[in-house]
Amino acid sequence: MKKNFLKTIMVLGALTLYLFPAYGQSPEKMSYQAVIRNSSDQLVTDQLVGMQISILQGSASGTAVYVETQTPTTNANGLVSIEIGSGTIVSGSFADIDWANGPYFIETETDPTGGTNYTITGTSQLLSV
């Protein structure tokens, strides 16, 4: 009797694993770091900076599928660490990006004074690790 019970439990467990497979999920956030410099190429340290991050599809000048803004504070080395996907959304939805339909590029715009007078500071292709 115990033997049949154990077999039944094992079969049910196997069926559960077979019928309900785990699916991979796209990330809802992405870590990003940058060193912020002003127009005189001096480090911007220990102050709020304005940032606008865009995810572009197709090329470095492609269509913006997601845009957000953030106002992080730089550290003593001018470094900011942010999570893309947790800022103030300007357009698009980070969760709705179809990562299989790339390539995708990240465009970073900054305002070292903490405002919204952004200038493009870089565009680079997003690559998996």
What positions do the PLM features span?
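Family-positioned intrinsically disordered, low-complexity linker/tail segments enriched in G/S/T/P
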Residues: 2-129
